[in-house]
């Protein structure tokens, strides 16, 4: 068994690239570790093949030759034991052949030849890498095809002088004729109108040929969800003569099913059991429109009207949830989407729906209404969405939150904040997504920004006026062949005007628009909404002001009151584990964050809470199923403690801190689907 495989002397080519060029590889970590290798079934064992091993030396030499190191030599050291083989490749790279001149001719006035040559992958002073030479030629071809020259020819030349370790490189370019699009040919449509295809593509008759527009057109066709296959290219022609200045663009499509039924189910730490269903009709009333009807239900089995007592067994995270919020969550909606609204780059959607949603330990929201959204896809493929929503909504939160922030402590007086009211908001969303996957990204980055504003000018009730902003940036890097390092920064704030209430002029922010923290997708050392301002109510029992403790039989209700400022930072290393055929992925992470309230506290370094943890992910067709365990070494957050007496909340303690639990209580378990970010 190959126990170890290493390299020495390699500087120009890293270990990972060398390993990928070879047939010989070392056994997995579990198969090599002394403590577990004896189990036999853990890890993948790799054995030495003498023939492939000798060929690996030639493969490494060939890689160095192509990379410009013509004098490279490779030696090996093989140490054998009764069970294992230890291999070491000793590489002497030698002096590389370097490019001393790069001449680019034939482009004329199309592009500045000297400037282009200085920006190609292979440049003067670099080792003479044949792979980069080919990549440079491909770059020149792509540039010409995007500027109206679809049939360029490039004659590559180079003169290598091994004794001097120098190479002169030249590209002689024949661009061919500059071409315009004569006509568009569409084939493959059956029930979908040809006009839908023509609206989606980015190339039109009379345009100067641009290959990038052909690729963009294919992407636009797939985004419609109307086609299983789409191809946009130059039509085949046996009669094309040299010097022709026009081409026909051929669009080939194959229609997909125009009906789609979705059914799903799952389990989450906070949602308990959840189900969803949806029916989508594509090309509804023609013109590529989409009609979508969907319904989602969660917290099945833990609240009215499906109270099966699951909070006492399979969903223990909900065991302490207030009965007011322990209800079935639902969202039922009907949406009509117009793919081309005013322009081919703009789409629109009208949605009507009803919702009941409970945010754990925070609030219950019921709403019915509609929204109108317009999305503009910029020339840089960055969608910007503006939306207006109007509905009738009711939000119920713990009366103690109104007592704490608004000094409204009579319980009947807090009813004014929970009455149904009109809610009208304007939203703006920005997404710059360059990650390679939505569910499980391994490289790239993603920037999102969200802005939402509510005011009486838009039709909102006088109590529902605020401005809220949130920005998030995440980045993903491969640090090994299958390991990924990911990090994220998220921050936001919400402000509201002063309103004249009975308690005085106060800034009221609705509970559903406040900032919360803690949980599987933010700071995992805390439970859902545990990070940030809290408020506690003594429902039963007594409080001793001398000791600052409640009696053993006391029942204290904890609610998250939220804040108006938030910042999160996360770092996570994801790496494959050598079990279950590589479908199990491990993770180590560190989360940091703070939720603050102006006037009470500010976002500071000392206030930021840092929690480490470990996790596991199992790859499935629907995305990774995730189990995370976060460790919280901090004492419980202190808060005000109230007690209801004769219809009023009486303050018992300004800074009440519950008793700390044992070591086990410092860990938080989170189970969900998809990566944390």
Regions found by a protein language model. Give the residues of each.
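Conserved helix-loop functional segments at active or binding sites
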Residues: 122, 203, 223, 281, ...
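Transmembrane beta-barrel wall of Gram-negative outer-membrane proteins
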Residues: 321-420
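Periplasmic polypeptide-binding modules associated with outer-membrane biogenesis and secretion
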Residues: 1-273, 278, 292-310, 315-330, ...
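One face of beta-strands
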Residues: 9, 74-76, 154-156, 230, ...
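Short hinge/gating elements
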Residues: 42, 123-124, 296-298, 317-319, ...
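Repeated loop/turn-to-beta-strand initiation elements of outer-membrane beta-barrel proteins
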Residues: 228, 259-261, 272, 284-291, ...
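A short, conserved beta-to-alpha structural element at the edge of catalytic cores
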Residues: 609-634
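C-terminal outer-membrane beta-barrel translocator/porin domains of Gram-negative envelope proteins
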Residues: 259-262, 266-273, 280, 298-301, ...
């Amino acid at each position: 068994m190959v126990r170890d495989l290493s390299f020495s002397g390699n500087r120009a080519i890293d270990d990972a690239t060398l390993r990928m060029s070879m047939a010989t590889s070392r056994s997995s970590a579990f198969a090599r570790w002394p403590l577990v290798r004896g189990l036999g079934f853990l890890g993948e064992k790799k054995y030495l093949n003498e023939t492939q091993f000798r060929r690996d030396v030639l493969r490494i030499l060939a890689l160095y030759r192509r990379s410009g190191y013509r004098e490279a030599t490779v030696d090996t050291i093989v140490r054998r034991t009764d069970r294992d083989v230890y291999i070491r490749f000793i590489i002497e790279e030698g002096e590389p052949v370097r490019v001393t001149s790069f001449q680019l001719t034939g482009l004329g006035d199309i592009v500045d030849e000297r400037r282009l040559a200085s920006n190609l992958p292979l440049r003067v002073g670099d080792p003479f890498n044949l792979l980069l030479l080919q990549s440079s030629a491909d770059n020149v071809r792509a540039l010409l095809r995007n500027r109206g020259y679809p049939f360029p020819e490039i004659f590559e030349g180079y003169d290598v002088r091994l004794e001097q370790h120098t190479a002169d490189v030249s590209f002689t370019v024949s661009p061919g004729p500059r071409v315009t699009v004569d006509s568009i040919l569409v084939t493959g449509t059956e029930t979908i109108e040809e006009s839908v295809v023509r609206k989606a593509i980015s190339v039109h008759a009379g345009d100067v040929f641009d290959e990038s527009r052909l690729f963009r057109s294919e992407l636009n066709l797939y985004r419609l969800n109307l086609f299983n296959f789409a191809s946009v290219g130059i039509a085949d022609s046996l009669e094309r003569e040299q010097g022709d200045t026009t081409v026909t663009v051929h669009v080939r499509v194959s229609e997909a099913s125009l009906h789609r039924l979705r059914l799903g189910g799952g389990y989450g730490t906070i949602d308990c059991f959840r189900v969803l269903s949806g029916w989508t009709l594509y090309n509804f009333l023609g013109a590529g429109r989409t009609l979508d009807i969907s319904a989602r239900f969660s917290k099945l089995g833990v609240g009215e009207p499906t109270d099966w007592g699951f909070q006492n067994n399979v969903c223990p995270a909900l065991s302490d949830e207030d009965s007011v919020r322990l209800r079935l969550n639902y969202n039922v909606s009907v949406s009509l989407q117009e793919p081309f609204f005013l322009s081919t780059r703009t789409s629109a959607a009208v949605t009507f729906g009803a919702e009941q949603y409970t945010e754990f330990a925070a609030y219950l929201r019921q709403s019915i209404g509609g929204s109108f959204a317009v999305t503009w896809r910029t020339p840089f493929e960055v969608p910007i969405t503006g939306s207006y929503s109007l509905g009738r909504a009711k939000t119920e939160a713990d009366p103690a939150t109104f007592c704490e922030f608004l000094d409204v402590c009579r319980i009947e007086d807090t009813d004014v904040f929970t009455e149904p009211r009109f809610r009208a908001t304007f939203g703006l969303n920005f997404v710059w997504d360059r990650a390679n996957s939505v569910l499980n990204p391994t490289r790239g980055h993603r920037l999102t920004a969200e802005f939402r504003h509510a005011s009486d000018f838009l039709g909102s009730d006088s109590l529902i006026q605020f401005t809220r902003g949130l920005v998030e940036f995440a980045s993903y890097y491969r640090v090994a062949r299958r390991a990924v390092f990911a990090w994220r920064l998220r921050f936001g704030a919400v402000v509201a005007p002063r309103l004249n209430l009975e308690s005085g002029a106060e800034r009221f922010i609705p509970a559903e628009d406040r900032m919360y923290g803690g949980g599987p997708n933010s700071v995992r050392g805390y439970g859902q909404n545990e990070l940030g301002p809290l408020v506690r109510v003594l429902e039963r029992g007594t409080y001793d002001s001398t000791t600052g403790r409640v009696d053993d039989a006391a029942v204290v209700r904890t609610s998250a009151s939220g804040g108006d400022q938030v910042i999160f930072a996360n770092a996570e290393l994801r790496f494959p584990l050598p079990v279950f055929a590589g479908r199990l992925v491990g993770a180590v992470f560190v989360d940091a964050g703070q939720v603050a309230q102006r006037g009470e506290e500010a976002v500071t370094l000392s206030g930021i809470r840092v929690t480490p943890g470990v996790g596991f992910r199992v790859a499935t067709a629907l995305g990774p199923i995730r189990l995370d365990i976060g460790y919280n070494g901090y004492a419980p957050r202190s808060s005000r403690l109230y007690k209801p007496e004769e219809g009023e909340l009486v303050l018992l303690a300004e800074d009440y801190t519950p008793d700390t639990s044992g070591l086990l209580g410092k860990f938080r378990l989170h189970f969900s689907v998809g990566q944390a970010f």
